[in-house]
Amino acid sequence: ALFQCEDSQIESCLFDNGESPLKEGKNLIVVNTDFGWKYPLWYNRNLTVKNCHFLKDSKSGLWYVKNGTFSSLDIEAVKEFRYCEGIRIEDTSFHHGAETLWNCKDVSLKRLEIQEADYFGFHSSDIEGESLHLVGNYCFDSGKNIYLKDSVLLSKDAFWNAEHVLLVNC
């Protein structure tokens, strides 16, 4: 739909039935928008996404993002946030967080609700998290440089093969 869109604001839209509507964008602000199909935001740089809804079929929606801020999202899809760098996620609900946040680095997480989150954070590094509530097994498997505070992780085998993990008040 908007391939290689730059320096733009997208507001109150619905992207449905069609792959990669905002692929390879730069300096985008996306607000109050619904995504109903897969791969909506791949290979974006300097991306801000706020008050958006990622429906069940928008799986694999946020991959290869460099420098992104994501706030107040409602995410029903699986396999979000892979191979991302320099991302901030806050005040967000992941209803099906399985296989999310894989191979990411330089990640800040604040006030997240993460359900059905098996293998959340796999092989990711340089993560700081605060006020996370995560339900799912094997979270942060093979992760590195992870600092979490004031969080609840209902998980078995969390941090398997992880290195340099610090948990405070968890």
Task: List where the protein language model places each region.
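Long, distal/terminal scaffolding or interaction modules
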Residues: 1-170
